[in-house]
């Protein structure tokens, strides 16, 4: 097989261009010569044989589409001549045997993590500031301005201006020349170099546009999401802003936390603006609670932990025609290694699994799990179709341009 193009699976009838392929190039795939009838862009695909309208197209060994136009052997596969298609799947498991990778090089390895009281171990140590409704986003901006830069955490700014240095020079009676020559610009690196709390990685301000104004189920889903952030082992504690009259009430968030972490002992400070004496009092209280929370969080130090305590979160971004033959297999193998060591891997963006549903169903350990996944994919597909869309619209124009 040439290094310039590749057939990923013996069942595939389209070929991936590893480099740009010029029209007229003679390619050799699986003992067959194919002359390219047009130039094929890097990351894009060309046909291994002729396709009639409706013919099935395979890649990675699975059905990915059907021809919408006649396609000659050696021609580019595009959204103009192919439409999305995927194999039917059933809520019944086929025989599957997982072969665990060799973990002998990793069984005694550890990582330096933050040990939480519930037994979970984080790889980071953050404090969260969360609004229960979008009405409180402004207060998060105020808190961020009051804390982030002063405590030495990275801000969105590339530099900071220290006007106070000029004021101090003036008060000290400095000459105009001395004041003018006083350095007042700090780079982002200089700001973070003097971080006050060395064991706290930062403060995350989780602004959003939910919590009120929609249906009640939206707020119920929101508080479950926020509860998940709070109990995450990468989080030391949280400051919660509530307006008071919104759909997403404090009690709902507390119930959501108790549902997933009944023994949660992390500090969570709830501030309700409509119960506060004034906005200034609310901000003062929030700053003090958050600062003292950071003081306690800073007492937690990294300690060795087994790899079985790791949970690897997987997320796509900028996917292209090479993702399926580079990053995805690498992350898949890393996930297999981690799972074999007793750890976990989580892929939450389930629409990415369209086309391999049966493979995932086969891998489920219980009938309950396989039904849950089956129902999830079926419900999402039905919801997308109901609004005139579908899985075929998952890739963005940028993804498609880059060969996905």
Model region roles, listed by residue range:
Residues 1-404:
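Metallocofactor- and cofactor-centric catalytic cores in central/energy metabolism, strongly enriched
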């Amino acid at each position: 097989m040439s290094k310039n193009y590749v057939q990923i699976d013996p069942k595939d009838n389209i070929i991936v261009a590893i480099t740009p392929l010029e029209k007229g190039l003679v390619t050799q795939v699986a003992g067959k010569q194919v002359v390219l009838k047009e130039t094929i862009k890097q990351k894009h695909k060309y046909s291994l044989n002729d396709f009639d309208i409706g013919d099935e197209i395979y890649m990675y060994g699975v059905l990915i589409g059907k021809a919408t136009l006649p396609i000659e052997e050696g021609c580019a596969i595009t959204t103009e001549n192919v439409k999305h298609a995927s194999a039917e799947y059933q809520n019944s498991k086929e025989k599957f045997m997982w072969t665990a990778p060799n973990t002998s090089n990793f069984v005694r390895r550890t990582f330096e993590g933050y040990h939480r009281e519930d037994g979970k171990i984080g790889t980071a140590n953050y404090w969260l500031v969360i609004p229960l409704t979008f009405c409180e986003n402004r207060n998060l901006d105020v808190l961020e301005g009051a804390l982030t830069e002063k405590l030495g955490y990275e801000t969105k700014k590339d530099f900071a201006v220290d006007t106070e240095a000029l004021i101090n020079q003036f008060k000290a009676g400095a000459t105009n020349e001395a004041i003018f020559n006083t350095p007042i610009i700090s780079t982002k690196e200089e700001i973070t170099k003097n971080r006050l709390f060395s064991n706290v990685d930062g403060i995350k301000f989780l602004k959003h546009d939910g919590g009120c104004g929609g249906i009640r189920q939206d707020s119920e889903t929101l508080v479950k999401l926020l509860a998940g952030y709070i109990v995450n082992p990468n989080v030391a504690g949280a400051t919660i802003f509530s307006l008071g009259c919104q759909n997403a009430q404090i009690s709902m968030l507390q119930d959501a936390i108790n549902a997933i972490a009944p023994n949660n002992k992390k500090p969570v400070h709830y501030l309700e603006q409509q119960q506060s004496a004034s906005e200034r009092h609310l901000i003062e209280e929030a700053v003090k609670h958050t600062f003292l929370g950071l003081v306690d969080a800073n007492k937690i130090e990294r300690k060795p932990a087994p790899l079985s305590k790791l949970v690897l979160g997987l997320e796509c971004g900028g996917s292209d025609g090479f993702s399926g033959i580079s990053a995805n297999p690498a992350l898949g193998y890393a996930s297999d290694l981690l799972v074999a060591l007793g750890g976990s891997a989580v892929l939450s963006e389930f629409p990415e699994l369209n086309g391999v549903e049966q493979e995932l169903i086969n891998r489920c350990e219980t009938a309950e799990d396989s039904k849950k996944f089956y129902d999830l994919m079926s419900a999402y597909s039905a919801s997308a179709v109901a609004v005139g869309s579908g899985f075929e619209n998952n890739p963005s124009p940028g993804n498609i341009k880059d060969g996905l």
